[in-house]
Amino acid sequence: MEGGSASGSASALSNDENLVVSCEDSSSPIGNELELGLTLSLGRKGYRDCRVYADDSSSSSSSSSLSRASVIAGIKRTADSMAATSGQVVGWPPIRTYRMNSMVNQAKASATEDPNLEISQAVNKNRSDSTKMRNSMFVKVTMDGIPIGRKIDLNAHKCYESLSNTLEEMFLKPKLGSRTLETDGHMETPVKILPDGSSGLVLTYEDKEGDWMLVGDVPWGMFIGSVRRLRIMKTSEATGKAQMIL
């Protein structure tokens, strides 16, 4: 009996060992954790638990690998879309090729322009402006009884007669244009500036020395070189202020 029981127990152990070995062989790809669980399990119930554990771990590992692959694929798609967007042309409406080339050429031409040319152009402009200022000779003109004075360019005139006509247009012409005023049935002609003062008005000028002189006492060239300002005065008030008034 003892021999039979010993042989029975030995056969049971051998069967259990075979089960453990077969479980270990079938679950060898799973890893160290599954091997540890198999070595601690005994019997068919332990074998079933071992297979269930192996199935769960394999399913979780496969799901994690799938999720990781999907994340990597999504990142690649996002990077590809960003690269395609950066390569697209921005702006609407689109610019034609020849227009774009012309714009580029214009930008290059403006960048390569000689700065000395711009400087010379500015210098020439300043010189022309200064020449115009020298060619023009403005003097102030006032008239007794009129608070507002005016300026006149003497270089625009060549003689005393032209100057007198311009001053008459400025100060003595009627406000209604060139028409004469009618008073008591008589036509009133505009007042003129006469050198002899017979019209009641005389044109005087102040020279560089500050003396008041009668316009027309010297040649036109000397007058242009010495005049500082002009004044239309009444003959009665001009006595004693101009040295050569008649």
Swiss-Prot record:
Example GO biological process: auxin-activated signaling pathway
The organs and tissues expressing this protein are described as: Preferentially expressed in stems and flowers.
Keyword Repressor found: yes
Transmembrane spans: none
Q: Where in the cell is it found?
A: Nucleus
Disulfide bonds listed in the record: none
List the keywords (alphabetical): Auxin signaling pathway, Nucleus, Repressor, Transcription, Transcription regulation
Show where the PB1 domain sits.
136-235
Keyword Metal-binding attached:
no
Q: Which GO terms describe its cellular component?
A: nucleus
Motif annotated as EAR-like (transcriptional repression), chain positions: 36-40
Classification via SUPFAM superfamilies: CAD & PB1 domains (SSF54277)
What induces or represses expression of this protein, per its UniProt record? By auxin.
**Could you give the domain comment from the record?**
The N-terminal half of the protein contains two conserved domains I and II. Domain I includes a slightly degenerated ERF-associated amphiphilic repression (EAR) motif which seems to be involved in the activity of transcriptional repression. Domain II is required for the correct degradation of the protein through the SCF-mediated ubiquitin-proteasome pathway. Interactions between Aux/IAA proteins and auxin response factors (ARFs) occur through their C-terminal dimerization domains III and IV.
What is the role of the protein in this entry? Answer: Aux/IAA proteins are short-lived transcriptional factors that function as repressors of early auxin response genes at low auxin concentrations. Repression is thought to result from the interaction with auxin response factors (ARFs), proteins that bind to the auxin-responsive promoter element (AuxRE). Formation of heterodimers with ARF proteins may alter their ability to modulate early auxin response genes expression.
Q: Which family does it belong to?
A: Belongs to the Aux/IAA family.
Name by which UniProt lists this protein: Auxin-responsive protein IAA11
The gene designation is IAA11
